[in-house]
Amino acid sequence: MKRKAILLIVFALMLQVVVGCESNHANGQVQTKQHADFTFDVKPETFEVFVEKDGVKERASEPLPARKVANVQKGEQGITWSYPEDKLDVSLQKKEDHLQITLTSTGTESFSWPTVKGPSYMLPLGEGKWIPADDREWQSFFKEESLTFAESFSMRFFAVNKNKYALLYVVDNLFNSTVDFAVDPTISFTFSHEFPTINSDKTYGFRLYVTDNDPVSIAGVYKDYIKEKGELLTLAEKAKANPDVEKLYGAPHFYLWNKSFLTAEDVKWRALKTKLDANFIGWMEQHLQSSEDGKESIQQFREIQKQDYVADYQKRAIISGFNYALRSREFYNPKLFTNVDEKTKELIGKGIDKLTEAQLYDLNKRLLKSVLQDAVPPIEKWGNADSTDLLKDMKAAGITNAWIGLPDWTAAYMKPAFIQQANDKGYLIASYDSYHSIHKEENQDWNTAIFEDKSLYENATITKKNGEKKAGFLQRGRLLNPTLSLPSVKQRMDEIMSNDVAFNSWFIDVDAAGDFNDDYSPEHTTTEAQDMKAKLARMDYIRDEKKLVVGSETGNDFASRSISFAHGIETPVIKWADSDMRKNKQSPYYVGGYWSPAGEIPERYKKQVPIKEEYQHVYIDPAYSLPLYKLVYNNSVITSHHWEWGSLKIKGEVGTRMLKELLYNVPPLYHVDRKMWDAEQELIMNYLKVWSPFHKKAVQQEMTDYRVLSEDRLVQKAVYGDDLQVIANFSQQDFTYENQVVKARSALIIDGKNKQTFLAPAQ
């Protein structure tokens, strides 16, 4: 009876806490402020926790099925107990400003706690979301959904909105954890943690805070936690180490698709036919046998000899063939290329196998020029329309700062002058890079998966718990263990930077996305925590040793000190598993494929498509969006959209996304080639004339306040520093705020005494 009575005891402990974060604009900083004390009760047999503040009692965690309890110890600072059948120890300890909850495995492989319920939630999914528990669209979206915590949550917390206050759980251990949703009758979710056998850390836990029921308070408490941990590093501090960071201020983000030596516009097609003799065509055919599109190119080389014109599709096929062959180390044939200049002879004399990639491309261009002669311009002018000429046009249009990304570094080797010109114009110029997947069979169009050390595929790839190798992106190849990658990172970066290409920025896929893996390979067993540290180490190496402004995918905040910008927080990859978007090419929602003719933007990035109503509600609708990430990291990490979902990608949402970019201080992201620039320049520049000067000022300050101003949540206000405000009206009606009319579908920017209105386009 005595033991049973112990199990039924409700332990109540007084906890003096900081429970709120009130907005205070003094000195442009978010200030925390003490509120009232709270008490908590816990029932060990069900692990049910209650919190009481100002006479209002709320359940902080739903009860588990009753279980056997042992070793209950109550002290002045807290309470501990064990679940002997679960092989788990539990500790709740009183701290100055929170309740520390720690769960330690003494043998269990996994445990699920807490399960939380509330009228609504504020979750750092991407930038941040407000999720009503009874919302049907969110219920549909979360039905049977399980999210990997480290990957899906941009920051290490979740908040439950109760009737009078919010409960904020800050997660101590972000690894090996999932969040599993239930939706009947309303949304709730459970945090689950696995204790891998290869990991000696057998604990997970939380800090539980009580704070005001608004995003500014929630983000403020978390920001204090980040400061306490020494994890906050501002852009200004990053710029002290590399002044180029400041080039991100007011900078839109562009991916330029100029990955071609020659374009159709470079060629005089009538003259070309006279230069293509049988020997040269035969040589080209040999090179194109291994190309995916080689058969089509070969056919069109032959067909145009019979015609007095060249159709556009034939031009594309022939240009594709040239561009493929120009990348080959076997392109030179001394019997075929006999009329070469002195520079070409000099390059040949160095030994083709010893040439850098940039030198190889220079040689091959010169060889082709010696055959095509006046059918093409001087090699310095090849591809200018989509590279150097485009940069000139962007600068002339008024783009002062810009981040420019290339699909991979070979585009720089094709035209090194383009990289230097971007530098000279004050732009940041970067290449996309990745150390995630590794392929056994090499594909030059996926060169990030090619590594000089060929032993890595067998000796440095990740093994799952069941002994199988973990597949790479798109189920191709394998995943490279990041703890074994740094020598290859150094080799690749040394090679790229030795090619006389003046990159000043770098974009690394995956590393800031929270995609961590345990590796059960006996030769190189690795935990998720070690995986994360290795990813941070290679980003830090590129940042510090190569002096590049580093960005990465998503930008989850474990990487906030390593990166200056990220792509994916604002609009993540939308529903990867939806076949209508990814596989069904007849669907109006099909986003397009990855392939494109050389030098053109792939449909995946340029094709404008609508999204399903459910996804619009979840991913785009401003009524459910919160700037949680910006309230913590606005002047620390610059975040934009995932490159699959650039600013112009979603049909019918272009204007809404512009307004949100202003409200949340987000750089627009565009995919650009000559055709796209000519078509969209007016739209882009009308927007950037407002956005760029605003961002340049706002990004150097904290977001100090955020408010929802209308009942439908379609009018919202954000404040940066002391006196820079944005009021965005996403609705179809004018809205009056403090005697000022904010027009429908507009953003009102108030900078001290200066006011400016941006009207969103009807797109």
Identify the meaning behind each predicted range.
Residues 27-401, 421-429, 433-435, 550, ...:
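Carbohydrate-recognition beta-sandwich/jelly-roll modules
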Residues 1-5:
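Positively charged n-region of N-terminal signal peptides that target proteins for export
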Residues 391-405, 413, 421-428, 433-437, ...:
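Long, K/E/R/D-enriched contiguous segments that form extended
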Residues 424, 438-464, 564-575:
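Aromatic- and acidic-residue-enriched segments that line the glycan-binding/catalytic groove
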Residues 358, 362-373, 445-479, 518-529:
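Aromatic- and acidic-residue-enriched carbohydrate-binding clefts of CAZyme catalytic domains
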Residues 42-51, 188-207, 211-216, 265-277, ...:
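Active-site-proximal substrate-binding groove within the catalytic cores of carbohydrate-active enzymes
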